[in-house]
């Protein structure tokens, strides 16, 4: 049965317009993105099949071009469309942070950092540079690979803070394993960077670790 033959209240697009996007299931949201199904399979049925094949919505969204296009109903055009949607979401979050103080929008900070780093397959260390009103000046990835005390250089972080004329910053890195709990090396690195940046009067407000769930804040655990 085509989606057009469904009761109007059950059609994903009509349901979204009437009740809001948050009320839709992953399959319904994906069906709206797909727009059409394939022969003998509605968009919602195709969406359910794809979610089953990928294992989760997150896995689908974070797949590379080859993996994405290896599934029935998906191709290069859809992949490009998906990347554009994801980038618009990241830019929307970045715009919120440039407009408001990060202290007034803590969830926006978490959402933005999660959007930027959670999909990375390798460890990435980055900084969110802030002005005197704690608005975002820039986001920069500074180091990639195995993030530990030996691979992250305080001198480089200080150099970039001075280049942006930053008054404060937020440190962040991801754990590709999905476990956001900080290691002893993570905590020692945070202390070293905090000490180095204090010499140029730049405050380290927090260090977020990005895993599978909500970003973990070292400040909230008293580890700053």
Curated annotation (Swiss-Prot):
Keywords: Hydrolase, Metal-binding, Metalloprotease, Protease, Zinc. This is UPF0758 protein PSPA7_6095. A motif (JAMM motif) lies at residues 173-186. One of its GO terms (molecular function) is metallopeptidase activity. Pfam families: RadC, UPF0758_N. Belongs to the UPF0758 family. One of its GO terms (biological process) is proteolysis. Residues 102-224 form the MPN domain. Zn(2+) binds at residues 173, 175, 186.
């Amino acid at each position: 049965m085509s989606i057009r033959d469904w009761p109007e209240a059950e059609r994903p697009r009509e349901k979204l317009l009437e009740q809001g996007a948050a009320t839709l299931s992953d399959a319904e949201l994906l069906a709206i993105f797909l727009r059409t199904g394939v022969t003998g399979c509605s968009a919602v049925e195709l969406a359910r099949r794809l979610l089953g094949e990928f294992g989760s919505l997150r896995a689908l969204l974070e797949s590379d071009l080859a993996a994405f296009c290896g599934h029935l109903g998906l191709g290069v055009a859809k992949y490009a469309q998906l990347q554009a949607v994801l980038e618009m979401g990241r830019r929307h979050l970045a715009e919120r942070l440039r407009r408001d103080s990060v202290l007034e929008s803590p969830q926006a900070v978490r959402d933005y950092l999660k959007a930027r780093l959670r999909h990375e397959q390798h460890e990435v260390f980055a900084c969110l540079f802030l002005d005197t009103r704690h608005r975002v000046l820039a986001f920069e990835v500074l180091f990639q690979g195995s993030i530990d005390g030996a691979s992250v250089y305080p001198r480089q972080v200080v150099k970039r803070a001075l280049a942006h004329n930053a008054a404060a910053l937020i440190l962040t890195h991801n754990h590709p394993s999905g476990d956001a709990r900080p290691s002893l090396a993570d905590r020692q690195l945070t202390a070293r960077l905090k000490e180095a940046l204090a010499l140029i009067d730049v405050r380290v407000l927090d260090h977020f670790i990005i895993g599978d769930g909500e970003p973990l804040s070292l400040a909230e655990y008293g580890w700053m």
